[in-house]
Structures are given as structure tokens and as C-alpha cells.
Amino acid sequence: MRGLRPALSTFLFLLLITGGVYPLLTTALGQWWFPWQANGSLIREGDTVRGSALIGQNFTGNGYFHGRPSATAEMPYNPQASGGSNLAVSNPELDKQIAARVAALRAANPDASTSVPVELVTASASGLDNNITPQAAAWQIPRVAKARNLSVEQLTQLIAKYSQQPLVKYIGQPVVNIVELNLALDKLDE
């Protein structure tokens, strides 16, 4: 019975710290230092939320740049179904999926002259990735240019404008946020 009081006191103290103080402190610091990120990095147009800069969207039309395949197949880019998605390299099912994706991309992009970029046929670890390389975006330019009646030069400039360089020059690679790029495409039509 003598050991119950210190154990209960320790439990209540840790419950207060880990269940109250720590979450409130991290929430307050996040809101103070990173308010846009702490609130989901939402992309707004007026009062309308168009998406998040952190989660891809399912752009399927020929007039849009397509991102990486979503691992959440039933409802693409569903964050509630996020999780590990890639099959092992030795799994024959992966070969079938990639072959089907390559065939679909080739059919949708008949004017593309080089091989299909790897990130357009492989899902990311979360299945929600919103970024592709500028080269993968450039590969899709002929299809998007034809569908939107835009020049290759206009789309090349748009990709360059929305390309983000890595924080450290030699670590990582440049990426293009597909959500922001496609929203910018829609603004060109206005």
C-alpha cells in the first residue's frame, strides 16, 4: 500500500505533462512559428480551399499535369488510407502494375519522345506525394499543351516558376508541386 501513493503520483504527473502540457505547448509553438504549416498548408482562392500544398490530388484530364500514382486506389490521395504502398522489387505484381501504368501513360502522351519517368509509374511511400521532378512534368508538356492550346514555351516557363530547389544544394533534387502547378494552369484560362 505504501508503494501505491508514489506510483499514482508519478502516473498523474506524467499524465498531466504528456496529455496536457506537452500537446498544448507544441500546438502553441507550431501556431506561433509555423501557422500556415500547422494548419495544413491549405491553398486558398478567396474563401475556397482548393487543396493542400502537402497532399497530391487526382488530376486525370489531358489538360493537367499528372502526379505520382496514389497508393490509395479506391479513393486516390485519401489521407485516411495512407500507408506503405510499394511492392517488393521481386514481386511480379509490381511488374504488372508498372507495365500497365507505362502503357496508359504512353497512350495518353503519344508525343512524348523519351522513356516514361520512373516517378510517374511508382507510388511514393505514403501514396499521397504531391511532387514530381521538373523532368517528369516536362515529359507531359506535349499532352497538356495540345489539350489547353498553350505553347511548349509557356508550359516550360510555368514549370520553372513552380519548381522548388532543395534546401541544401547537393542533397535532394528539384521538385514541382503538381497541385500548385495545375491550379496555376487553371488561372491561365481565366
Swiss-Prot record:
Residues of the signal peptide: none
Gene Ontology, cellular component aspect: plasma membrane
Gene Ontology terms, MF aspect: ATP binding; P-type potassium transmembrane transporter activity
Superkingdom field: Bacteria
Pfam families recorded: KdpC (PF02669)
Record membrane topology: Single-pass membrane protein
Keywords annotated in UniProt: ATP-binding, Cell inner membrane, Cell membrane, Ion transport, Membrane, Nucleotide-binding, Potassium, Potassium transport, Transmembrane, Transmembrane helix, Transport
Keyword Transmembrane helix: yes
Keyword Membrane: yes
Localisation per UniProt entry: Cell inner membrane
Matching InterPro entries: KdpC (IPR003820)
Transmembrane annotation, as ranges: 10-30
Subunit details: The system is composed of three essential subunits: KdpA, KdpB and KdpC.
Chain's role: Part of the high-affinity ATP-driven potassium transport (or Kdp) system, which catalyzes the hydrolysis of ATP coupled with the electrogenic transport of potassium into the cytoplasm. This subunit acts as a catalytic chaperone that increases the ATP-binding affinity of the ATP-hydrolyzing subunit KdpB by the formation of a transient KdpB/KdpC/ATP ternary complex.
NCBIfam families: kdpC, PRK00315.1
Family of the protein in this entry: Belongs to the KdpC family.
Name of the protein in its database record: Potassium-transporting ATPase KdpC subunit
